[in-house]
Amino acid sequence: MSLSARISVTSLYRVEVSGWDKSQTFFVEKSELEWSEDSGKHVTLSSAVPDGSVVFLRLIQPLTADRSQSVPYETEFLSVTPDGQNQFRLHPVSPRIVDRGSVN
């Protein structure tokens, strides 16, 4: 009888996160994106970001002059770390379809 164990691999990426914090102040912060197939994408920020808000992540690529494109994510607040950092799970943002055929 063979038992196969599933190994979860977590990858870390340096990212630049930007958006608006709880006081509606725009911020840009460097952090690490933790990416796992099992638990999804997580980021820890010093900025207090409202739950459910949209932030933009840009991958920081060393050794290249090219800037990657920012990608929007919706935040899901998870917890505050012992040192006061805010932990979030990130969910992809899909474009919303607006019905412009309605006349008010």
Where do the PLM segments sit?
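Structured alpha-helical
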Residues: 1-104
